[in-house]
A protein has these predicted regions:
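Mobile, glycine- and charge-enriched loop segments
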Residues: 1-45, 141
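S-adenosylmethionine/decaboxylated-SAM
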Residues: 30-249
Length: 249
């Protein structure tokens, strides 16, 4: 049995156990419900299947939370490396905000065995991503689910486009939020990104993805196209979502 298969079994078992319980624990025994903070099983499986589909072998994630999306990505990496082994930094996840859950997300990585192939960067993404770029890091795929403020998401996507290989997939969560949609509006009009939208009633409904269009900068120095969420393709986008409304499952 290869290292990848052994880890796949361990991660899958941990995911199944966690979602059966419906919560994770911190080291002090305090419980943190999976919903609404983390991905449900079907959402996480949809993310896993996207990573498998892309054949990604090195991935980047912004936002650890309770680690359910991380474990789904790592399960996919194990599948894509099934004949061999994963490097100690096969998956990089950036999250400075584990204090709210007393590092329960990190604990999930440890208990599943996924920490052995995960580089956890406990810094804000606007500090960590430029460092990765300066180190000439390269990833096959990125999953963006960190701060959901427009300026933070814009920076995350900007750097991911320079860190992910050309045509590699960049996935964003929570596309129903106005800040995410506005970033997508810019991506469509100014970067010529082609959005991949999923069945709004299916398990991937929270996500939107696009193949990284970035190569060497070829736009005129003063290029700019007007943008807004209204420039997005037809889709049941959840515009005008009131504050405090429940997050789609």
């Amino acid at each position: 049995m290869t290292q990848a298969i052994h880890l796949l079994q361990s991660v899958r078992a941990r995911r199944e156990q966690t979602h059966t319980l419906g919560h994770v624990l911190d080291d002090a025994g305090k419980t943190y419900p999976i919903w609404p903070v983390a991905y449900s099983t079907e959402n996480a499986d949809a993310l896993r299947d996207l990573v498998i589909r892309e054949g990604a072998r090195r991935t980047l994630e912004i936002g650890l939370g309770l680690a359910q999306s991380s474990l789904a990505i790592i399960e996919a990496l194990c599948k894509n490396h099934a004949a061999g082994s994963l490097a100690a930094d096969a998956h990089t996840v950036i999250d400075p905000g584990q204090a709210w859950c007393n590092r329960a997300g990190v604990r999930e990585l440890d208990l599943s065995g996924a920490r052995t192939v995960t580089r956890f960067i406990e810094q804000p993404s606007h500090l960590a991503l430029p460092q990765l770029l300066a180190s000439n890091e390269r990833f096959d795929l990125a999953f963006v689910d960190g701060m959901h403020l427009f300026d933070y998401v814009m920076l995350d996507v900007f750097y991911c486009m320079r860190l992910v290989k050309p045509a590699g997939l960049i996935i964003l969560d929570d596309h129903w939020m106005p800040a995410i949609q506005t970033v997508l509006g810019f991506a469509v009009t100014n970067w010529d990104a082609k959005l991949e939208l999923f069945d709004p009633k299916g398990p991937a409904r929270r996500m939107v993805a696009f193949a990284n269009p970035f190569q060497d900068e070829q736009r005129p120095w003063d290029h700019f196209a007007e943008f807004s969420a209204q420039t997005l393709p037809e889709y049941p986008w959840k515009r005008n979502q009131p504050r405090g409304a429940p997050i789609p499952a």
